[in-house]
Design a protein with these regions (language model features):
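Class I SAM-dependent methyltransferase Rossmann-like catalytic core
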Residues: 1-32
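Class I SAM-dependent methyltransferase SAM/SAH-binding core
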Residues: 36, 44-101
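A conserved beta-strand element that flanks and buttresses the S-adenosyl-L-methionine
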Residues: 118
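Conserved beta-strand signature within the Rossmann-like core of class I S-adenosyl-L-methionine
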Residues: 145-157
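Conserved Class I S-adenosyl-L-methionine
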Residues: 161-185
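Core SAM-dependent methyltransferase catalytic element
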Residues: 196-216
Length: 216
């Protein structure tokens, strides 16, 4: 990941995956309301998606202060009326900032209805507790019918879907023993505990998956 003097960080994978992800989001996201992006990272996805999803309000977030600075920097280069400043959200917290209406008022969001949560490439580069926190938060925040969208590599049936994913998993675990490619069935089981129904799994380029849940 490269960082330029203007604070914009760049993740090369975003340029490769943003269009395929957008095509899925255009189909599965609600047409109105706030879409909360968890672990927005550099902010490149947010600035690409928001102007192409004009019916919704895109709210990025990240627990890392440097990532939030990058998100704000990208927003200055590519402003959009429906793109809001990033919030500091750690999914492992028992209460997220979006559960406090005054926090949304501060950034000018008058409509406090979060109708979807998007999380791209997080749960394999975070402790398992982050996945647990994500599901718990989505279960608390989303209304009935609300959408949770995940993107990234997953194991299916306890097995890697490609040799490249197996090697990636090994490299992740060498970097941090708490990281790793997650088993999709384990993720969906946790989701069920928080009233999140697995709607569909969509194969994506480079052996990734889009996984869609609905609050019920």
């Amino acid at each position: 990941m490269n960082q330029s003097p203007d604070l914009r960080q760049h993740a090369p994978a975003t340029e490769r995956n943003r269009q395929p992800i957008l095509e899925v989001l255009q189909r599965v996201l609600p047409s109105r309301g706030i879409v909360l992006e968890i672990a927005s990272g550099t902010g490149e996805h947010a600035t690409f998606f928001a102007p192409r999803l004009q019916g919704i309000q895109w709210l990025p977030s990240d627990p890392d202060i440097n990532h939030r600075a990058s998100i704000e920097a990208w927003q200055r280069y590519f402003p959009s009326d429906n793109l809001y400043p990033p919030l500091a959200i750690d999914v492992r917290s028992s209460v997220w900032l979006v559960e406090q209406p005054d926090q949304l008022n501060e950034i000018g969001l008058k409509n406090h209805s979060i109708t979807a949560i998007v999380c791209i490439n997080m749960i394999h580069i975070a402790p398992w507790s982050a996945c647990l926190g994500l599901m718990a938060g989505a279960g608390r925040i989303l209304p009935n019918g609300g959408i949770l969208y995940l993107y990234g590599p997953f194991k299916q049936g306890g097995k890697h879907t490609a040799d490249s994913n197996k090697m990636f998993d090994e490299s992740l675990r060498l970097s941090n023993q708490e990281w790793g490619v997650r088993d999709l069935e384990e993720v969906t089981d946790i989701a069920k505990n928080h009233h999140l129904k697995h709607l569909e799994t969509i194969p994506m380029p480079a052996n990734n998956l889009s996984v869609v849940f609905q609050r019920c």
